[in-house]
Amino acid sequence: MDLIETVNACVGLQKRVLKLAPNTNLNTAGQSVLNDYNALASRVNGRTYALLDQTAVYTPYTVNAPIISLAVRISTDDYDDMRSGIDSILDILAAAIRTEGSRPTRVIERRVIEPNVKQLVEDLKLKSLTSEISIANMAAVDTALIQPEIIETENPLFADIIEQVIHRPNASMTGGNIRATLGRWSGNKGIVTCMSGMDSEHRFTVDFKTRTCGIINVVYAPTAGVIMIPMPTGRNREGHLIDVSAEMMAENFAIDFMDDDDIIQTETGVGVFSFPMCNRIRFRINPWDMQKHNDNLWTVNLANWPQGTSPRQPAISFLFETRRTFTEGDYQHLSRCAPKVQYMMDTIFPETAFTNRPVVDWNVQSLLTSSSQKTWCQKIAMLIAAYAAKI
């Protein structure tokens, strides 16, 4: 969208201006910044545009961007004028975002329609296709101007829950002859408890939103004393647990990194692992088996475990966390820049600053993932994200 591209370019110029310093000789790059600023200021200085302010009222905004005299050395006054000039332009662009964002849209647009905003974009005549904030680049991706950006995602996992319970007919009231895998995960973390009331392997998968690579950290956590077991049929039962993580060996805990049904890489034990591009993780866990029992690793409460009548059942709990995960950016993923966009939404672009707004919660994630008024929501998020890249 041309308004996003204009914001990108003006934000880029602001950063170049702020890299300069007053009372300092300008090198070639500094002279280029001065020339680019003067070219922009000469086109819009003194012009007035009626745009929405932060109270959603049309207000005349006048650009105050003085032209700076060319010199080898920039004075303090000239530097302050240049800095305030680019800030004045950015303030008007913020008003343009509020104005254009208030106009509902149903399809992806390459050009703004709002007359006052369109005039501002034509007067500035400065555009840049990409932003430092990945959310703002999604408009260029949607129109096939650039390839999807590789981003570090903060929420690679689908939110999900596992309640996997297998039991024999003679299951006891304390969890004997029951294999239960209970847990949940969302964002980039999950915690799971595996209770082995019988000799059987726990096996379950955790799905990524899309093909992802990165680092995963897995660590044992203290197991609860008693858990509720949601039985497939009949009343729920209690699982009385004993933490056996002290006797867990590497071969008792395996992690398969899978691309659909193909195993790409397998790691054993807990720890920190780098994993290749995959779209699901499969855990294979065996907290307790007959071999451990025959090796006399059991305690008094596990003496009758093979018969399923022991008062407590062997169990482990573990926490897993994906870290530094990278994937192709899309609307499902939140990158590290999302909180900065949210800050701008809460300060410069509150929902009360728009004369019309989609019926969604006013936060970045809701705008990006809304299925209602989808294109309009995404347009607002991308416009604000482009502005959020400013210093």
UniProtKB/Swiss-Prot annotation:
Keywords: Capsid protein, Intermediate capsid protein, Virion
Segments crossing the lipid bilayer: none
BP terms from Gene Ontology: fusion of virus membrane with host plasma membrane
Keyword 4Fe-4S assigned: no
Cellular component annotations (GO), alphabetically ordered: viral envelope; viral intermediate capsid
Molecular function via GO: host cell surface receptor binding; structural molecule activity
Entry's localization field: Virion
Protein task: Intermediate capsid protein that self assembles to form an icosahedral capsid with a T=13 symmetry, which consists of 230 trimers of VP6, with channels at each of its five-fold vertices. This capsid constitutes the middle concentric layer of the viral mature particle. The innermost VP2 capsid and the intermediate VP6 capsid remain intact following cell entry to protect the dsRNA from degradation and to prevent unfavorable antiviral responses in the host cell during all the replication cycle of the virus.
Assembly: Homotrimer. Interacts with the inner capsid protein VP2. Interacts with the outer capsid glycoprotein VP7.
Family from the record: Belongs to the rotavirus VP6 family.
HAMAP family assigned to the protein according to its UniProt record, in alphabetical order: Rota_VP6
Protein name: Intermediate capsid protein VP6
Source organism: Rotavirus B (isolate RVB/Rat/United States/IDIR/1984/G1P[X])
